[in-house]
């Protein structure tokens, strides 16, 4: 049965809650008998359930929780209901009773059960915003259905709750909630979770009224901690507690009061936080070396009321620092106690500690830090001593000082075991030094030491034990190990201690083994201090060699003598199953068997062959053979009897198991003699068909097979048939030959006697296959073919046919007749031929002979068919001058079976022999000369015929380089010329010139290649020398380069200056200004100013100097003046002056009233100045425009006439 406590409003219970939300189990709940019924009260989130214990006290339980209660008689136990509320018991149709606690209000008494069970029905506004309620959900929430007595889901209507204002609140179900966040869980949240909760809390406080003003038990979120309020934490009935101030409960909440409620809530939280920050510094007591006791008092002003039942409803955090007052603190304790024991501290260390107080998720500031110093104590455990030096009778040890823990180390205690292991330790040194020397010790002895440190407070623990050895002698060679016992896969060895070693000396023994006879190396098998060893995983019946070495701290002895021992063999495996060897007769048979696959590692001494017959009872086996042979023949057995055989073997390893048995049955009596075979039909030339009858048999055993024997004319007998049939066909016979046949029968008893002989003659047939014909070559290039007569097959040969061809597919008949030889002529040299032969008689044609291959002898090469001169061969392919050489090329002719060795080139009066090549350069020829050339090939046989004559002419000599001259020199260019451009000879030869310039690296680079006789080199540097050379090339080739010519560029003239600017001054004067030109390569620049007055035709120079301005006085009014200026470069090295072009002219008119100046061509505003003469640039533009117009006009006229 389940009792669900449902609350439709927050209940301001004034009862003390349980500490940490734990549900106190009443004694009668735990110790009740089995007949009582358990009633489970489900406390929803944000609700409080109060019960009365047996002692009369009231206990408050916060939701979510499930409270089990015992009912002795099945009735609802008494539930404490606060004032203004009633408990209503509702029973559904299934008999399940539930308790609903509702306020005494008409609207809270629902007429129907579903309304009372609605999660948000008649809830005040502050409950709808509580984080333990789920908002904006479209899912209906029902109590957990765990039995047939639960309420049907239709009593829980689905509600669409208002939109939540909590962004990241955890969703908790309304019913069935049995776990919740306790105070300890909230305090143990990680920092990043706390920060996230703070952000959520700020949003909640800004968007919802605080639930604490209604004295609810909802969970508030502040400072990163969430905690459920207990009934008494919000202010008890007496109001004496220092908790959050109690306000009167309201039945409904109005949105207009939200701002005032939030301000009041924040003031309360601020007041609590200020009280928590006033906690006093903790008290330190019971200071020890590694522990201390801290205690503190709760902050003043927040003690609980008399109804709370709690003395200290706070939690505290203790922070510790060993880096000073302002160092980094670490939280070492978090809980609700007022005292904590700090352990694992460092002795003689200064510490600072401070405490924080927290109440209801509000954390105050830390207290004033208090300092303390742990006491000093005994030193730390030192490290083991180290061996500094040793001899045969002394050991020198040294060590480092451990941590003194606040008190200076006064002495060290060194103990040893005096070389007696496991006999206890005794003091061997006590003092303040950090080293100790022990003398009068035994050689090669191990001593165990341990160390402790002592100060004024006490003695430390002992260090780890360390073993040190004195020097000693290398052990003597030990005696060879002794074999104690040998097994199949193991041997046990034993040895003695080497002579001269004391009983206390520690000796390490290494047992080495040689496993492979081919490998002379010994491998270690055991290393230790024992005097015996069992070597395992060995091979059976195998010889091994062992030797022993002894070693101590001083070194290793020589190996002992070698012990040779052998492992024991294993018993052999069973032999193979016996097999019948030869035929089984009626009175005996032979059997054989193979040796066992596994002989156990030793030789097989003898085999036992056992036999039993099928009539024996209980399979009584008898030994029929005992010996070393692997086969045996049984005789005098009963015909037609079943026998079983098995074998076993014996070796030094033991007696093997028996093999599988072999059943063998003896044969019956052989059949009688058959009648002679007879011919069925007429004999053929290659086969006969025979048949015979079943022989008579007295034993009545069926014949299983027949055997037919044939005797050839050479008295060679062979079996031609073996099978159960009464007839057979014998083939591959010779035509016209007499054969003798006889037959015998076979059954289980063996073969019967042969029948009488039948003589049969085969019919005549075609001739047999001819032998391969013999081929021989004659000196005159003919081929002589001869052959022998084949077997006639009972009839004379009437004709031979010889076929000849280059391959098998091209064979043709070249001879037919009765002769046995034939001569073939007109064959190609070094050619491949083949032939075959066939014989004929009256019975038909015989088979062809084997194909015979033949190759005719080689001869002299054929004439060269293609001979030519390479005209387009590159000139640089051969170093010789093309005017004195010819490049010949030809195709290789047919060599007629012999590789070509050389070629002979005939030039008429001379001949040249070259190797096996298809190209040759004829050198040392006359320029511009015609030659008649022919060629022939030569091989080992001889020289072939000459090819046809060809005519070839050599090229003329290449031209000589012309003389190079400088036609014009400029500051950035040089115009070069060479040769005579009007010469007809040069034009006819079509000469190409290559002009090269020498760069800074003294290398010549080509700058021009072509037929022209002039070239202008541009982009040069002024007043610089350049070196050139030239080469002429024609169809005859490239000629030599000329000598080097050097030419120099001139200096640059100054650039043209823009038109000057004229400015009228006072009186009859003006000032002329022009732009300056920078110095050129260090040479200064002067300026020349000229003026043209009125209608004069020539300019007059009025100024020359380095200034860029000049003033002229004494001018006449209403007179046209034109000024122009040019720059003049004065060369310092040559005292030469280079003048540039004059600038455009600038017009100027001196007027009395208004002077109009211009620096441009015709840019004055005065009408009289506009009618002045145009400048030089305007004249040039007019001329260019006129020529362009005339050109376009003439082009239209020409196009018109051409189109017409």
UniProtKB/Swiss-Prot annotation:
Alphabetical list of InterPro entries matching this protein: E3_ligase_FN3/SPRY, FN3_dom, FN3_sf, Ig-like_fold
Location(s), subcellular: Membrane
Transmembrane segments: 1182-1202
GO cellular component, one term: membrane
Record keywords: Membrane, Phosphoprotein, Repeat, Transmembrane, Transmembrane helix
Domain Fibronectin type-III: 278-377, 381-473, 477-570, 574-669, 673-765, 766-859, 871-957, 958-1052, 1056-1153
Chain positions covered by the region annotation Disordered: 185-215, 228-262
MF terms in GO: RNA binding
Leader sequence residues: none
Effect caused by changing residue 927 to S: In a breast cancer sample; somatic mutation
Phosphoserine carried by residues: 208, 393, 1163
UniProt note on tissues of expression: Predominantly expressed in white adipose tissue (WAT) especially in the stromal vascular cells. Expressed in adipocyte differentiable 3T3-L1 cells but not in the non-adipogenic cell line NIH-3T3. Expression increased in the early stage of adipogenesis.
Membrane topology note: Single-pass membrane protein
Gly residues bias locations: 228-242
Polar residues bias (residue ranges): 205-215
Gene3D superfamilies linked: Immunoglobulins (2.60.40.10)
PANTHER family: E3 UBIQUITIN-PROTEIN LIGASE TRIM36-RELATED, FIBRONECTIN TYPE III DOMAIN-CONTAINING 3BA-RELATED
Function: May be a positive regulator of adipogenesis.
Family affiliation: Belongs to the FNDC3 family.
Protein name stated in the entry: Fibronectin type III domain-containing protein 3B
Gene name linked to the record: FNDC3B
